Regions:
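Short, surface-exposed ligand- or partner-binding patches at beta-edge/loop junctions that are enriched
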Residues: 94
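Rhodanese-like catalytic fold shared by cysteine-dependent sulfurtransferases
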Residues: 1-33, 40-90, 101-157
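Conserved G/P- and acidic residue-centered "switch" motifs that form tight phosphate/ATP-binding loops
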Residues: 98
Length: 157
């Protein structure tokens, strides 16, 4: 499983936002983007957020590669190459439960903060509970919180 890096800056705090708040923001703000950091099998078999009323396309970029869950060494570069940084204010990161996306948001925020021309102009935010949410008492996801549980638009291929 992907672990946090020892070289993370200690002074960066990643805020969290509930899925319904994130969707509302993405529906009205053209400077906000949703970045889904799950794996290709998760997108294909579990589903993915649907951009029905969102102002921008969803960015799909694997934080780690299935099945070994090794970190994508090009993750940050792939994300930044898909964005016009002059037009971004908020980047929302989502994964299955909110864990990987937190590390992904932290990693991108750290990189952005190192670039003086955009430092403190773009905020990386974690989608609390992720796409599927926490495990229920019977060890199943999607029954207590998360994007799908909140009734937000999603698709499955």
């Amino acid at each position: 499983m992907v672990q946090s890096s020892d070289n993370f800056e200690k002074n960066i705090i990643i805020e969290e936002s509930l899925p319904s708040s994130v969707y509302s923001e993405l529906s009205i703000d053209h400077t906000s983007y949703l970045i889904d950091v799950r794996t290709k099998p998760e997108w294909n078999f579990v589903g993915y957020p649907y951009i029905k009323n969102m102002k921008n396309d969803i960015i799909f970029c694997e934080w780690a590669f299935y099945p070994l869950m090794q970190k994508n060494p090009y993750f940050e570069d792939e994300i930044l190459s898909k964005l016009n940084l002059d037009c971004c204010k908020k980047l929302y990161f989502i994964c299955r439960s909110g864990s990987r996306s937190h590390y992904a948001a932290y990693s991108v925020q750290t990189l952005l903060n190192q670039q003086q021309n955009i430092k403190n102009t773009i905020k990386c935010i974690n989608v609390k509970f992720g796409f599927e949410g926490d495990l229920s008492e019977d060890k199943r996801r999607g029954f207590s919180n998360g994007w799908k549980f909140s009734g937000l638009p999603w698709k499955q291929s």
